Amino acid sequence: MPTQLHPVPAPDADPPVLVAGGPFTAVELQAMEHDGVLRRLIAGAYVPVQCREAPELRARGLASILAPRLVHRTVVGRLTAAWVYGCAGTPDVPVLLVDGSRRISTLRASHRLLVHEVYFGPFDVVELAGVKVTSPLRTAVDLAIHSEDGVSVPVLRRMLAQPRLGLTVGLVARGLDALPRQPHLARARRVVARVAGAPAS
């Protein structure tokens, strides 16, 4: 069962996330963005301009543009998870992960997103506002392995700078050491060494 991260207290509890069709059209939402009333959170999801962003709000925003079955069957991962945690830019194409025991062909058909088949450990998934997201540690390990150095290094540094995420360079390194052998593991260790500001061993 996903772990529940402790929410960050916010002055505006559960600000609305608005998408086309309820109760405004896409044109009306864009007009309110132009007027400075709303700001775009991700794709077609908008929030009041004065509300403070938090991981829970970004998770809700992402869920609002996905079909409910995707929200229930997938886990937000990689750079999209880093965005949820406030450590990466807004993704143009959300990255979703699905457990290797599930079928993913039907998830790829009609959505502008990337779906990867992976395997999860018992502590790899947390829940934010009802949305499953890879844990900070799993996210950091995935970024070190799967993202280009120029992308992963600054994002990992931002993640390590957030005390709430509970990450250290040593913890990420141990996460990599716990993985079975795979093609990009040596490069991932070099990425973590760069983040630590030390030469790779």
Residue ranges of model-derived segments:
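Short gly/ser-rich loop at a beta-strand->alpha-helix junction or flexible surface loop bordering the NTP-binding
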Residues: 1-201
